């Protein structure tokens, strides 16, 4: 898929592709006028440049820094929760409101059906996730994916509903953090997130957590307790954003690259640390370059995980989940 947004580290590839397109257009427009020898020479030159572009693209995306992965996770054309829901599931019915205060548009959720027609697999699920906007108007409507307390309470209400009807829960995380406004604090932001952690740990149905973009601090963990944690290749998950970390440690946002390295916030880092269970491979260039391929990959992995989790007895499911999170962050001094 063509993209209108170019990140700094992608410019060398974009510039070569522009040159390549010019050469292709030149070949098309002049092939009838030029001698066969000249056309053949131009064709060979194009072929050589195509190989160079492909090699450069692979070199860039196979050697991304942690900060560059943060940039890809924030790409404005990256697929969001509703995109994945509509690409992966059918019969989605959105449910609204926390039954206490309001309906937070930064979190969406509802019942859907996860199907694989080739194998005949069909599983009703409850899917919940953060939702960002694509432009200024929709971002204001979605509060830039930063949930209020009522968003987390809505999410918990839907999880409890799924538990009542014995349906597994899938959460999709993509947030720069929970909304930090005074009004959110007055309505119990910290309590709402803490309550979700407590209740999610005890849910008697399978819970699969997927980090699809940004996973910042309490805003992410409020939907992040599950039996299996999957993470997109170019996403990030951390207690703090690189910019905020930089502003605290160096009193400036100019050290965000160093902060990203220190935080070790990528999928590869977190897999090594035992925080996540699997990495979801992305198309070359990021999920936004081929959203349908990305959704297909994620759908396949979700079906695999659900097939493994659905037969697990309730008590064992809860005990395993609690043990999984209790083991995180344990440090042993062997010296």
Curated annotation (Swiss-Prot):
Annotated InterPro entries: Acetyl_CoA_COase_a_su, ClpP/crotonase-like_dom_sf, COA_CT_C
Annotated ranges, domain CoA carboxyltransferase C-terminal: 48-308
Recorded coiled-coil stretches: none
Keyword entries, A-Z: ATP-binding, Cytoplasm, Fatty acid biosynthesis, Fatty acid metabolism, Lipid biosynthesis, Lipid metabolism, Nucleotide-binding, Transferase
Catalytic activity field: N(6)-carboxybiotinyl-L-lysyl-[protein] + acetyl-CoA = N(6)-biotinyl-L-lysyl-[protein] + malonyl-CoA
GO biological process per UniProt: fatty acid biosynthetic process; malonyl-CoA biosynthetic process
A UniProt-annotated Pfam family: ACCA
A single GO molecular function term of this UniProt record: carboxyl- or carbamoyltransferase activity
Subcellular location(s) of the protein: Cytoplasm
Chief location category: cytoplasm
Transmembrane segments: none
EC number(s) recorded for this UniProt protein: 2.1.3.15
GO CC annotations, alphabetized: acetyl-CoA carboxylase complex
Family: Belongs to the AccA family.
Function (record text): Component of the acetyl coenzyme A carboxylase (ACC) complex. First, biotin carboxylase catalyzes the carboxylation of biotin on its carrier protein (BCCP) and then the CO(2) group is transferred by the carboxyltransferase to acetyl-CoA to form malonyl-CoA.
UniProt cross-references to NCBIfam families, sorted A to Z: accA, AccA_sub, PRK05724.1
Protein name from the UniProt record: Acetyl-coenzyme A carboxylase carboxyl transferase subunit alpha
Organism of origin: Chlorobium luteolum (strain DSM 273 / BCRC 81028 / 2530)
Gene: accA
